[in-house]
UniProtKB/Swiss-Prot annotation:
This is Small ribosomal subunit protein uS10. Part of the 30S ribosomal subunit. It comes from Methylibium petroleiphilum (strain ATCC BAA-1232 / LMG 22953 / PM1). Pfam families: Ribosomal_S10. Belongs to the universal ribosomal protein uS10 family. One of its GO terms (molecular function) is tRNA binding. Involved in the binding of tRNA to the ribosomes. One of its GO terms (cellular component) is ribonucleoprotein complex. One of its GO terms (biological process) is translation. Keywords: Ribonucleoprotein, Ribosomal protein.
């Protein structure tokens, strides 16, 4: 039988929140007997915006804003049924986006 793998990708604006969530997922998977590879930090995506301060003149006066999207990747190799059930019941914070792929 072919080995199954679960790939989990986390995205969040706050790096503390994403690290905490990754740690919870790793602990849950290890408790149920699965092998975990990761979390691997992926490159942080930065979006920068320049906005004029004044509504009419003073083009040289601008505000700069930045949004950073942090990402983590982890693989769960050869998961058991217990692992899948435990991951489904796991309650993660609202600011973390989770993508799960079965391979």
């Amino acid at each position: 039988m072919q080995k199954q793998k679960i790939r989990i990708r986390l995205k969040a604006f706050d790096y503390k929140l994403i690290d905490q969530s990754a740690l919870e997922i790793v602990d849950t998977a290890k408790r149920t007997g699965a092998i975990v590879k990761g979390p691997v930090p992926l490159p942080t995506r930065m979006q920068r915006f320049d906005i004029l301060r004044s509504p009419h003149v003073n083009k040289s006066s601008r505000d700069q804003f930045e949004i950073r999207t942090h990402q983590r990747l982890m693989d769960i190799v050869d998961p058991t049924d217990k692992t899948v059930d435990a991951l489904m019941k796991l309650d993660l914070p609202a600011g973390v986006d989770v993508e799960i792929k079965l391979q």
